[in-house]
Each structure stands twice: as C-alpha cells, then as structure tokens.
C-alpha cells in the first residue's frame, strides 16, 4: 500500500526470490514457526515470485532481483535455468538488475557464464570478512557489484550494545555467534 503514494523513480526496490512456502519442492530450506520453507530456483518459481512482487508492490518493475539461497549442489535447479529466467525478466523490463545472495566464487562465474550478474549481496563487516578472500576478487575481475548485509552485526558494532544488553526471547540476535557470552565480551572490548 505504501508504494501507491511514492514517486517510483525516487525509490530503489530490491527483493529476493527462491524461497517457496506455497508448495513443496525437493529442497527443504527450514521450518519457521510451523511453516515449511523450501528452496526453488526453477524458472517457473522465479517468474511467479516476480509477478507476485510486482502486483503486491503496485509497480511495473523491480530494480534488483536477488536469488536468496543458491541450489547448485542439489542438481535440481540448473544454474543455467535460473539465469535464463532472470535474463528473460530483465529483457522484458520487469527487473533492471540481476543479483544473487549467499554465493561462492564458482556460482558467480556460473551466473556470468550463462548470462549476467550485476550484484551480489553477502554478509560483510569488521567481524565477518570471508568475502575478501574469494568473492571480492572474483567480483572485481568480472565487474560485479557487492552489497553488504549486516555491516553492523545486528547492532553489535554500534557501540550501544553492552554485556548487560538482552534481546527478547525468539530474537535472531540471540542465535548470532557474537552474542554468546565470551565472544560478546571480546567483541565489545574491541568496540
């Protein structure tokens, strides 16, 4: 509803596809609050996700479409099919940029082999720097942009978190490894 009242040209809309809860697929992702979530990067699912997003957001295009979780190890949804579906959506003007989250250097190369990859989204912060070893050099080589997520480690690096800070039961921050007592103290000493 909010998008109905916003000048679309002043907003960058990005969304993700590839997690499926409408129907069962061969690749289980996880169960959340009793809802089973599957991974599905088939062309049919990607196109359905985009059409649903366009309708819900009252827009004719998405600026960035990310695949949320990759599935190449399962051999069920060929990367070529995933990329071709995204390229088709881009050619139709329904998406402007192709993105991928939770990738490896090989997956980045695969996207570029079968079509195009404009941007990846990976966890990157002062504490989580694994992207620097392979992903950043690969992206630099292939001209792929990088968008960091969780650069402040869910608030831990803001300087506002103390050893006395608690989070509500069920908060995802309780499961982050940095919030375990000993690691939490070490990190806070650095901040």
Describe each region flagged by the PLM:
Residues 1-21:
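N-terminal binding-site loop/beta-alpha segment at the start of enzyme catalytic domains
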Residues 26-130, 134:
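Glycine/proline-rich, positively charged
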Residues 14-15, 100, 146-148:
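Hydrophobic residues in well-ordered beta-strands that form the structural core
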Residues 17-19, 104, 124-128, 150-157:
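Glycine-rich beta-alpha junction loops
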Residues 132-171:
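Aromatic-lined glycan-binding groove of carbohydrate-active enzymes
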Residues 179-186:
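Conserved small/polar residues in nucleotide/adenosyl-binding loops
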Residues 190-191:
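Hydrophobic alpha-helical segments, chiefly the membrane-spanning helices
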């Amino acid at each position: 509803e909010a998008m109905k009242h916003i000048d679309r040209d002043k907003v960058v809309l990005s969304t993700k596809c590839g997690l499926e809860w409408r129907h069962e697929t061969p690749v289980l992702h996880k169960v959340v609050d009793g809802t089973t979530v599957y991974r599905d990067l088939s062309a049919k699912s990607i196109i359905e996700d985009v059409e649903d997003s366009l309708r819900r957001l009252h827009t004719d295009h998405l600026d960035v479409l990310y695949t949320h979780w990759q599935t190449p190890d399962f051999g069920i949804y060929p990367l070529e099919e995933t990329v071709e579906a995204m390229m088709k959506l881009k050619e139709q003007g329904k998406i402007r940029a192709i993105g991928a989250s939770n990738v490896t250097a090989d997956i980045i190369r695969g996207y570029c082999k079968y079509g195009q990859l404009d941007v990846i989204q990976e966890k990157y912060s002062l504490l989580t720097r694994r992207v620097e070893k392979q992903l950043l050099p690969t992206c630099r080589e292939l001209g792929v942009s990088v968008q960091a997520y969780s650069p402040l480690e869910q608030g831990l690096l803001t300087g506002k978190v103390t050893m006395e800070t608690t989070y509500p039961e069920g908060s995802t921050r309780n499961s982050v490894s940095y919030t375990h007592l000993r690691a939490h103290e070490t990190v806070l000493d650095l901040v």
